[in-house]
Amino acid sequence: MELKTPLYDCHVAAGGKIVPFAGYLLPVQYTGVIKEHMAVRTVCGLFDVSHMGEFLIKGADALNNVQNLFCNDFENMYDGQVRYSPMCNERGGIVDDVLIYKVNGEEYLLVVNAANRHKDAEWVKAHLFGSASFEDISDSVAQLALQGPKSKEIAAKIVPEDGIPKKYYSFVKDVDVQGIKCIVSRTGYTGEFGYEFYCAAADGPKLWDILLEAGKEFGLIPCGLGARDTLRLEAAMPLYGHELTDDITPLEAGLDFFVKLGKERFIGMDAILAKGDPKVIRVGLKITGRGIAREHCDVYSGEEKIGVVTSGTHCPYLNAPVAMAMVPVDYSEVGTKVQVDVRGRRIDAEVVPLPFYKRA
């Protein structure tokens, strides 16, 4: 049976089309994916992302555990900073991709993908060592994402000036948003300027209403999962189960920047080092023929099948069909011409730089 986020009734009241996703009933759209996508690119959109998982690692060995679990380096983080990192298995495959919030030297908040919450919890607990504790606080937290060029002006109406994080990938905790205690984080999954708000689950619906009211004059609208997916694809952000799996290494997924092979160790480091340079890699494809390449479509060079599409759609802002795919390194150079099999028909495509969209 699917679960409901604390904002379920808000979505129904707003006319959201509810679908099952990652074990939850969530809105796929309200007024339409294209309208919601364009609102985020040009004005602002509000998303309920309360289905995401939140864990706490606390204790004198909290940092040592975070260093061991994740590929990125957390040694020089400041309190109030956020870092993104893959979390790998012993084979170098990706267990999940996670946001790590440093609350202080003995407390870290981990934000994980909803579909991986229980798997991740078991993984982290199984590898915890020393003086460190683990707590899954997901059910007690609501998370809302305010995304788009007008986010700053909307947030300024309801958030005290010292509660607005100034730097990208930073956060402020214990912020009073009209009586609601929040973490305000300058993060997002859309490729736009924006913030994410964390509060107690019971306060989620009230915070939703506060944000929508504050954004009314700017054209803020609620957005669903459909727009969230097209936005992240335009911004070439990988999605677990598509560009990231337990068989794909971070280097193959194009996440080299977040893999610090110079640090002492992390789970999966030995396997990644042993594999050496990746043989296959994530690339962007611009579809030049007629059609849309979807997940699982095969990629060809002539008659040779060389790879597979991991995500694909028609991107509203670009007004063009694009895709991400895993192909051999020999076919990854920008400008390489390939074909994609769409329901038995080959359509032309070309390797292009990622991301497809980058805000000005």
Region roles according to the model:
Residues 60-94, 151-180:
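Internal amphipathic helical hairpin motif
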Residues 73-120, 126-127:
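Well-ordered mid-protein domain cores that form the structural environment of catalytic cofactors
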Residues 33-42, 87-97, 128-130, 176-183, ...:
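Short amphipathic beta-strand starts and helix->beta connectors
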Residues 1-28, 103-360:
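Conserved, structured C-terminal
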Residues 1-85, 93-95, 226:
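Acidic, proline/glycine-enriched N-terminal capping motif
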